[in-house]
Amino acid sequence: NQNIGYYGGDPVVKLQEEKEYDLVVDNNFVLLNFFSSKFNKAGLENQMVNIWRLATNLDASSRSYSWDRDDRYTIPNSYHLGGTPLNDALVSLHQILPEFKKQNKLQKVQCVILSDGEAAQMPIYKEYKDYRDDDVHLGTRHYQPETSYLRNRKTGYTYKLPYAYHGFTDVLLKDLKQIYSDVNFIGIRIVSARDFSYFIRRYGYISETEYKKARKAKTYSIKESGYDSYFAIIDSALSNDD
């Protein structure tokens, strides 16, 4: 079956048809729907308990003493934490958004993307010749920023691909906004206090006075990004009871 690949010896369903120069979405990428307005009160309570158990166990797994405890819950396959598949998630919105609007009979949608990190640029499929037998195979490689563009085959729009990894995410967002003009894309980035200054200054100049205000408030609204609204929040602000 051409739609089946293998990862670590296990079969994995391919998420896309593999074509040269297309972006590569990792076949191990999945989105999990933990909470929904379709839950009743009992279902929501049960799911919140499950999430608490999972989060507690993931935290305990990093502590050596916890491995000898008998009351640890088993973490399900594919639930272990890894990288940040932010760009893969943005690509998947091309399928999710129209389905969500149709199922819920919506005209306007607020799409909120919460992340605690960035993602690297997505690779592309590229043919190469095997030096051993001269056979041509389809592999993956990083694009060349100085000569690479993203083209949406449906809209015909093209976007220059940047060198910076965060700029690549902005390109994906611009493409989404071009198609889904009735969707408001809101980004929320949880950032450590140590990285707060570097992160917000990445998107443009901020005076020292404005930075001190943002530091005190532990949040800052970034104007120059691919999101319609983009908020940086220092992680310690999440522990406040106010």
For each predicted feature, which ranges?
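Acidic, glycine-rich A-domain
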Residues: 1-242
